[in-house]
Amino acid sequence: MGVAADLKVVASLVRGMDRDRHSTHAERIQRFYAPQAAAYDQFRERLLHGRQALIAALPCAPGDHIVELGSGTGRNLLFFDDRLAHAARADLVDLCPALLEVAHERHAHRPNVRVFLGDATRYRPVHPVDCVYFSYALSMIPDWQAAISNALRMLKPGGTLGVVDFHLPEGMRQPARAFLRRWFGHDGVRLSDEHPRFLRERLDTVSFSTLRGPIPYLPLIRAPYYLFIGRKRVADPAQ
């Protein structure tokens, strides 16, 4: 692929996600990602930092049922390496058919991987699961609180929720916050400083860190992101 593929992705980013109020969120997502689906992973490898670190830290054991909400192309499952083969089942859930086509092709030979077209705020497996994670998905979900609540409802007591995503860290100056909100918002990414606080209020925190990573073709800007791993409380009537 190379530079030509990058240019296709950059062109989509420059155009941005449309704001057609007569379209659903799922329709806007499909229109935005379909033209760049084939080159999606190559570009995002240099933009979506911390995914491998998050998955390496998830305490998934053989026989576990894993769910990724907002899975896109299913690239993140490969970060599990040998652990994936020993999982009882891994569900990939996304709203975008174009990205899920890539996921289908990538994991067609894995009998324990299932791909679902679905909403992260509503998808629910029949039985409780051991681990749920979001990788750069919460910031794309309008009702991200509902997505987190849904993840908690599908988790077993003591189960693990992991998140890696862009955010606005505490203490960031207002001009920088305004620029990043506008720049990311052009492509449908809703930057917030509320995700970590919401997560810590609802789970027992196992680990939390904030970092910054480079953005392709923008050498002077480093995007802030966070990694969170939490454990569902064993006795919580709200969950």
PLM regions and their residue ranges:
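Conserved class I S-adenosyl-L-methionine
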Residues: G2-C60, R75-F79, P175-F179
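C-terminal alpha-helical "lid/dimerization" subdomain adjacent to the S-adenosyl-L-methionine
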Residues: D20-S23, E27, F43, G162-I221
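Helix-to-beta-strand junctions that scaffold the AdoMet/dcAdoMet cofactor pocket
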Residues: A85, I141-P142, L155-K156
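A short acidic, Gly/Pro-enriched loop at the edge of an enzyme's catalytic core
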Residues: T121-V132
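A short SAM/SAH-binding and catalytic strip from SAM-dependent methyltransferases
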Residues: C131-D143
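A short glycine-rich, Lys/Arg-flanked "PGG" loop and its adjoining helix->strand segment in the class I
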Residues: Q145-P157
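C-terminal lobe and adjacent flexible extensions of AdoMet/dcAdoMet transferase-like proteins
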Residues: F228-Q239
